[in-house]
Amino acid sequence: MSNKESNVALQTLRVTKDMKDFLSHRIVGEPPANIKIEYQKIHRYRTCVCPSTGHISELCPSGDLILSLGAHRNVIAAATVYDVVKNKTKSTTSKAGTSSTLSSLGLSGFQKPKIGSKNKKTMFSKQNNSTNESDESEGEEGSSLNDLPKSDLINAIMELASQGRNNSKGKGRRGGKR
């Protein structure tokens, strides 16, 4: 290793079906298959480069390598993390491993948002487009997930993780209200 080597690397986060379903209600266009997120290499540990506080992925209680946007409690739901090592991408978790991880974190049973319930607006809601009937006729092709600021994507994924935690209140390992 040379001193010229960068201390920042990329991880590619695969967008799963659950994540895609969630994002499709909040954006116009097709969600991407992968999201690339930078992380900082500190010795042998990997710490996320996030707007919030990072965490060391090796300290994940489930034992799997999970990429968090912000603090560890805000784990991305339904995500498979890929490790980028010397320009090669290899899978670090299996599909079964991801499912068991989500289950252990209490994030596996979240429900899709109900469209039109109390007109709850998110960062991805179109302010100009208030009716569902005109969605198809307008065909706004210029607005896709890739065009959105990174912070909007992070907020949507945080909302997804939060929704999963709320649906599992009282069932988790932390001993919620009983």
Swiss-Prot record:
GO cellular component: host cell cytoplasm
The keyword Cell inner membrane belongs to this UniProt entry's keyword annotation: no
InterPro entries in UniProt: Pns11/12
GO molecular function: RNA binding
Keyword annotations: Host cytoplasm, RNA-binding
Pfam family for this entry, one: Pns11_12
RNA-binding among keywords: yes
Biased composition (Basic residues): 168-178
Intracellular or extracellular location(s): Host cytoplasm
Name this polypeptide is given: RNA-binding protein
Organism annotation: Wound tumor virus (strain NJ)
